[in-house]
């Protein structure tokens, strides 16, 4: 009798190229693959890996968060903030410090504000010429768990110490907010 081999763990599941058929993205992948091969810098490896990622793993980041992270790192205005994703505007911030940003996408309002305050916006092919090894740059990304879908992940809703949101149709007092959630309806957890 032969032994049945379990092939469950044989395949390594990770992206080696982007799912998207966007030719410009594919060109960037080609460029950063070349850069990593020639420089062996971790910076290029990280950018290459993030270019493969799905849109949900390329979360947007606001201008205020970019400014905050730059300030935390104590970086001057010559440093380039690198985001493999979208940079969005933040209307709550009246003042936008001068900063240089490199991103896959920059929203119209964010672009307007960066340029208005004397900053620069780089594309990734321009960044490859300016900083091929990632010198004088700061890599940053948005919060991946900020999506609404993440509020439903975790311990089952209704279990003690769970803050997970249930998937509900009705949000009234008599439904998921009733038994176990208020002392007037059986008990309160």
Swiss-Prot record:
| Gene3D superfamilies membership | 3.100.10.10
Q: What is its main location?
A: cytoplasm
Q: Which InterPro entries match?
A: Ribosomal_eL18 (IPR000039), Ribosomal_uL15/eL18 (IPR021131), Ribosomal_uL15/eL18_sf (IPR036227)
* A Gene Ontology term for the protein's cellular component: cytosolic large ribosomal subunit
> Which keywords has UniProt assigned to this entry?
Cytoplasm, Ribonucleoprotein, Ribosomal protein
Kindly state a single biological-process term from the GO annotations of this entry.
translation
Q: Report if keyword Cytoplasm is assigned.
A: yes
Q: Name one Pfam family in it.
A: Ribosomal_L18
Decide whether keyword Cytoplasm is in the record: yes
Annotated compartments: Cytoplasm
Q: Which GO terms describe its molecular function?
A: RNA binding; structural constituent of ribosome
Q: Which family does it belong to?
A: Belongs to the eukaryotic ribosomal protein eL18 family.
What name does this protein carry?
Large ribosomal subunit protein eL18
Q: What is the organism field in this record?
A: Aedes aegypti (Yellowfever mosquito)
Q: Which gene encodes it?
A: RpL18
